Curated annotation (Swiss-Prot):
Record-stated family: Belongs to the nematode receptor-like protein sra family.
Species assigned in the record: Caenorhabditis elegans
Residue ranges crossing the lipid bilayer per the database entry: 34-54, 114-136, 150-170, 199-219, 250-270, 284-304
Lineage, broadest ranks: Eukaryota, Metazoa, Ecdysozoa, Nematoda, Chromadorea
Example GO BP: sensory perception of chemical stimulus
Protein name according to UniProt: Serpentine receptor class alpha-23
Primary site of residence: membrane
């Protein structure tokens, strides 16, 4: 039965008129330029974000390590996205008048399949690592600050295993039969692909709720510490917790929004499949790589959030200096208060 299905898919080598028209259209060429621009901008901001994380202690060491690894993963994913677009445009130019040569056989795309979906899943499950990082920092604060790198590495290993498991469920043993317009399309016989996407959506929604709760707890805790504690270390730790939790909330919401816009758009097109031509479906679908947009938002959010937090710190320091004068005056005032 599978062999018959494979043979049937392999026999559909030629692109339909609508699909061939879409693949050779100006819209797809513009899409290649647009996505490539998105990728190149994400490269620049990934480098700036990594530098910002490396040189500043805005986030805890555990969160910084997780974010740096996620940024490196995003670079690999973006490179794969751009490569699939460029090879598609190249083939559409070379075989513009040959609809039976313009499509890619799924077996030709095996390497892209591994890189694209593994990095895609790893990127999605970063929300899992970041959420648990925040939970541990709140509920096991002392342990967290003593073992930050161990916690980060453990969460990253778990994140990688989740990505591998998702890839295994979706594509293990799936015959690479049939033809696809681009190499980032999943094989036509991968029946569990949509199930994995649904699971990822549930994971992201759950992480948004949990991280929002962790942020609420960290804000509440910081207010209490500011009232009751005069320890600079404890007060700064609480402030760092709030800043990190807020940033993680923003990152997860951005990731979810980008992915959901893509999923909603594709699902809407599928629902309207009878009313929408194959040509229109292909053209619009090419502009909906949600993870590619998420991988642009990630470094942008990290970079600008870091800069904003540094600026806020400087303002706080300036306020303190204006209130207490220079350091010498402040020390003298403290000594005087201690004498009484």
């Amino acid at each position: 039965m599978n062999k018959t299905a494979e043979e049937l898919l392999d026999s559909l080598k030629c692109a339909s008129d609508g699909l061939a028209s879409a693949l050779t259209s100006v819209t797809l060429k513009f899409n290649c330029a647009f996505i490539s621009t998105i990728v190149l901008i994400s490269y620049c901001f990934s480098w700036l974000a990594i530098q910002a994380l490396w040189n500043n202690n805005i986030f805890s060491n555990s969160t910084r390590l997780i974010l740096i690894v996620c940024l490196l993963n995003s670079v690999v994913h973006q490179t794969t996205v751009m490569e699939t677009r460029i090879t598609q445009i190249y083939r559409s130019i070379v075989f513009a008048s040959e609809p039976c040569e313009i499509l890619f056989r799924s077996s030709e795309c095996e390497i892209e399949l591994y890189f694209y979906y593994l990095t895609n899943y790893f990127s999605t499950y970063s929300v899992f690592s970041l959420t648990f990082d925040r939970l541990i920092s709140h509920y096991k604060s002392k342990y967290y600050h003593m073992h930050q790198y161990f916690i980060a590495i453990s969460l990253l290993v778990l994140q990688f295993l989740l990505a591998i498991l998702s890839f295994y469920i979706a594509y293990h043993g799936v015959p690479l039969a049939g033809y696809v317009p681009m190499c980032n399309y999943y094989p036509k016989m991968a029946v569990h692909h949509i199930t994995i996407n649904d699971v990822r959506t549930v994971v992201m929604v759950s992480c948004i709720i949990v991280t929002g709760f962790a942020y609420y707890l960290s804000v509440k805790s910081e207010k209490q510490i500011q009232k009751c504690s005069y320890s600079p270390g404890e007060r700064y730790s609480a402030y760092e917790n709030v800043t990190t939790s807020q940033s993680v909330c923003i990152l997860i919401v951005l990731q979810f929004s980008c992915t959901m816009i893509s999923s909603f758009g594709v699902n809407l097109l599928l629902m309207m499949q009878e009313a929408v031509s194959e040509e229109t479906f292909t053209k619009v679908g090419a502009f909906l790589p949600g993870v590619a947009y998420a991988n642009l938002c990630l470094p942008l959010a990290i970079y600008f959030k870091t800069k904003l937090t540094i600026q806020n710190r400087k303002l706080r320091i300036a306020v303190m200096i204006s209130m207490y004068g220079d350091v010498g005056e402040h020390i003298a005032r403290l000594k005087k208060s201690w004498e009484y």
